[in-house]
Amino acid sequence: MALDGFETVRIVSAGGGVTAEFVPDANMVCHSLTHRGDELLHAGRGVRAYAERGKTMGVPLLHPWANRLARRSYSVGDTHVALPEPEGRYGLDPNGLPIHGALPGRLRWAVQEPTAADRTSARLRWDGDELLELFPFVHELRIDAWVGDAGLQLITTLRATGDDAVPVSFGYHPYLQPPGAAPRGDWRVSLGASQRLVLDAQMIPTGLTEPLSPQSFQLGDQSWDDGLAGLASPPEFAVTAGARTLTMTFDEGFDFAQVYAPPGQNFICFEPMTAPTNALISGDGLTVVPPGGEHRTAFSIAVADN
């Protein structure tokens, strides 16, 4: 199948109630997830705008850093990186800070032969000069996706394939769009975290936290763009709207979250993150994988009738 000139990979649950579609040449983004024919993801400006300009949509992978960096340079151990000019390489936020890692159109995944109609796997080698100038740590990523009649599970494994250890700072940015006509103000939200990261004026964590309260609430006219820590076990984030509830569970490997719900938009994002925003600079919460080692993550998006 093709979408905006991109080939897609479609998987279908055994019972036929859930489908998911991925775009290998646009960073393996899951651009569509349906339940009984109803779309659960916000399409944003479409796949081409995502691939070429980093306009996030669907369920995008943010790699090699999730959300923002406080400047255009960082150091990990003895490796010091000065990022090149952003054009065609990575995006900038309104403050001119690097955001969301490499532009998706630069990340083209090799899809593995399918073993069943309800799953797919793909690999990305991070070893070319254009990628290493952003993140000079040779590694491989693997995505394994599976759909059941309750939803989607997505497993991401980073393996350090070079001679150097690899810092892990990726995340995902799922744009959940509850089906039906329930007004945004009536949505009920629950957050599986106990702490909010204190941010500075440029949305960079200061290193301080404050209690998160309440953890369950009606969204109303609230606006969210907040980093969270102190995740529950298991970390579950949910939105109830109309007749269905969408629940994200961070199954493995994600210790931080970002919640994004801008006013006037019919989506909410519960973002699983391996490290907090700016971890490549601050070092806070940063996992480093030794040569030959790996870091595995998993999250699930489930849909249920109320």
Each PLM stretch: what is its role?
Residues T240-N306:
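Active-site pocket scaffolds in enzymes
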Residues S75-H80, Q112-S121, W146-G151, G180-R184, ...:
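A short, structured loop/turn motif at beta-sheet edges
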